[in-house]
Structure formats: structure tokens, C-alpha cells
Amino acid sequence: LLEKTNTISEREKQDQLLDAMDLEREKGITIKSHPVTIFYKAKDGKTYKLNLLDTPGHVDFSYEVSRSLAACEGALLIVDAAQGVEAQTLANMHLAMDLNLAIIPVINKIDLPSANLPNVYRQLEDIVCIPHEEAIHASAKMGIGIDDILEAVVRRIPPPETEKDGLLRALVFDSVYDAYRGVVSYVRVISGSVQRGMKVKLFATDEVYEVKEVGIFTPKMTRTDSLEAGDVGYIIANMKSAADVKIGDTYTDYTRPCPSPLPGFKEIRPMVFSGIYPVDSSDFEALKAAMAKLQINDAAFSFQAESSVALGFGFRCGFLGLLHMEIIQERLRREFNMDIISTYPSVIYEVTKTNGEETNVDNPSLLPEPQEIQEIREPIVKVFIMLPGEYIGDIMQLVLEKRGSVTNTETIDDTRVMLT
């Protein structure tokens, strides 16, 4: 898409262009959403400004996806012609449907010898409930169908709706920390406009800042005169602390503020907890600063100070899953040169004491005395497992080994079954 619209030159072409982190390139996954503005001259002769957000697929980063979707009107649902509809395809599609986005299905990799289009058609209709005629056939590698995708975006995805009052409303959907420029907020301008020199206010903190720079992503940060309604771009406003801006907050004009903030994002609940401690106890403050900077860039990561008899002072950290935990630990080592020790991951337990008091415990060392405990409850997950029919016995055995129970078995098509 970037190549076809001349957003990037031949010289800039590389695999995983929008995956800026070394970790993303090494693991072949997207961890952070990446915005980019492209200009497309359509068949009707008009030039359209399209704001593209490349989001992760893995369920551990679903919060990243949901924030990005809140800044969009539509989504391209990419299905692999050989692999078919995968679990994460479904999970992310439900997020898009909850936000009433226009969904354009794209069947990619049709050039592969193993591509099975009839099977993908059936899955799209049976599992995703989208008529297969709506799907665009494409091969990113061969450049097939790219024009069709761009035309479909122009035709099928509605243009941004804006408030008629012209007051500035800009949703903060992400932010990063720059050592030289401070906090950089990624925003979607819902209404009004913002330019350099303007005084803006954030609703959550009620703080006022002067805008130093605004711009768009092409994919690199590119300064512009202003951001208008419908634009996705960035605002730099002299913020020095990672805590100054909250993801989901609203920027408005200090002199003509809008009456209320935009609906933000639902608070995310960590699922997995682990202790992270510095190997050298003198690095405690440096580790704390590193975590604060990571948190500004990853709102799903939480931490609070704790101490251990064996490991000294460190932090109890919350993550969305095991991959999320692994990525955070690796980023601390690579980006901040931290030498860390991490404890075995655990979940939150609900404990009812004999006196009727209820408490949540995410660290086994904080459990009450055995004689004070009436009941301990652990999280239960309702899981839908899509699998090839021939593996049903093995998977059922695995579920039982993990203390699960199969409540329903449903045949999806000739080859696949869904267990609940």
C-alpha cells in the first residue's frame, strides 16, 4: 500500500517497514501499532488522504488493537489464503464490530501454491459471517489487488464525521517518550484543528501546554502546519514527564474548550503478574524510571514497588499475557540496559477470609494465614478452540490435563471443529 501510493521510495523499501523495534523484526510480529498517512489518487480523479494504522495480531496486544480501532472508521481484515481464518482474526474482528467499523475482508497470499480459496470462502461465510463476494483477492508480494484495496477503502469506508461546533477534540490513542523532545502524543483529531503555538488543555489532568510541533507519519514523523479534523498525527507540547499524558485523554483548545472529553478506553486489567528486581540493588531508581517510560508507551503494563526477603527491592508487574511479559522484560534489557531478575508468573486470586472479608492477592507471599482462609478462587476462562478434526482427541486430553472441561463440540466445516 505504501509503495503503490509512493509514500515510500524504492530506497526505503524493506520487510516489516512499520515495525520499528528490533524485537518486532526478530520475532516477525507487530507489538506496537504504527500510524502512517498516505495520499491516494482514486479512479474518480480526486486525491484522498488515508490514515492507516498497522496493528498487532497477537491476543496479548489486543489493547493496542482496540485503541487503534477507536481512532478509525474502517478496517482491512487480512486473511491468509493458505492458513484460512485464524483465532486472532476472529478476536480482532469482534473488536472492530463492537465499534461499528466498516470491515473490508482481504484474502492475501493468493499466489501461494498452497492457497485454498474455496476453503477460505467457506470460512469467511461460516465463521466470520461475511459474504465471500465482498473479499478482495490480493498478493502483497506480487502487487496483485492493491489498487482494488485502495479503491475499496475510498468507496466502502465512510469519511470521518466531525462535530459542527469546530471546537478542538483530539483523542490520545498512544504516546512515546523522546529523550530530546519529551512526550510525543499520537492523536486522532475528531473536530477542530491544532497548530504550533496554540495553548491546549488535557481533561484528565487539567494541565495547560503550549504546542511546540504537530505533524503526520509518512511513516517517519513529518512536521506540518496544522492537524485538521479527521487527521491522525502527533502533538509535541513540552511535556517532560511520562505521567503528564494519559492514553484515552482528550486535547482541547484552552481558550475555547469543548464541554466534555471524548469517551476514552476501558481500563485494562492485567492477567499475569510477576516480580521484576534489579540484579544490583543500586539500580532500583533507574529501573523505576525505565518502567515509567515503558508504561507511557504501553498502557497495558502496570507496576508497583514491592520488596522480597531474598531479592530486595523491586516491582510487582502486571501483564496481559506471557508474551507481553516476555516482551517487556526484553525491552528493559535492550532499551534501558537493565540487568534484571524476574519471578515465576502468577495470576490474581480472590480470597474469602473466615471473618467474611474478601481480598485479591497477586503474590502468594501475601496470602493470609491458612486458618484465616475460608475459600480461594482462581480466574476461569471461557475458551473457543478451533482445530482440525483429526486432533480433537489430543486437544480434549490437553484441556483435561489443564483442569478444563469441554462443554460443547461444533463442526465448522469438513475439516475443522470448534470446542468450547
Model-derived regions: residue spans:
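Structural and coupling elements of P-loop NTPases
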Residues: 1-420
